[in-house]
């Protein structure tokens, strides 16, 4: 059974990703927002998007524009639109299996400068989120939520690791209560999601990441912003080092 705080956490993440679009590029930005929610696992494979009326309000668009965007993503294989009482737009996208060849292709498509920029952006906003959260004096329910996200990640089956890793990292930003910071962290994660999905998962690296995740949480719960920043920096630099190794 889901807990009330789980629902609040999921709702916060949806609000972070499915934010209003600009009128001039409503269709394109709607596709971008929905694709971000899908690729980040905010709406996992097999689950359905929120109801059409709710989505249109969240995104600040007409239902006609929303339907066009959903149709485009359905045609591209990301969604399965079902009619009827139990219908809706169901996520069919499943991240591809990690592959070093795919990793090189993703990096080539991004370009060296864009890759460096994306990694720098992620480091800045995730370090900032951890620092802010460490100074916030988390209430008991929020401490429990952070610990539960860590526990879920530690117990994740390999095929669900990236999605729960994303949920853990985004939870840190969302728990700060800053919509702008949470949005920035979601954007940063989106820029490297294909990259992270393509990195082969090595058990030694996953074990090391688990230690680093624990260090991040420990520093946050101890109210140690400098320690939180150092822990996030070490963790993200480790990911960058692994990336360089597979590209060498």
Which residues make up each language-model segment?
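Short linear motifs at protein or domain termini
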Residues: 1-124, 131, 248
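Short helix-capping and inter-helix turn/linker motifs at the boundaries of alpha-helical repeat units
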Residues: 25, 159, 204-207
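Conserved amphipathic alpha-helical segments that form helical-bundle/coiled-coil interaction surfaces
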Residues: 118-198, 209-215, 227-237
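Short, charge-rich amphipathic alpha-helical segments embedded
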Residues: 237-248
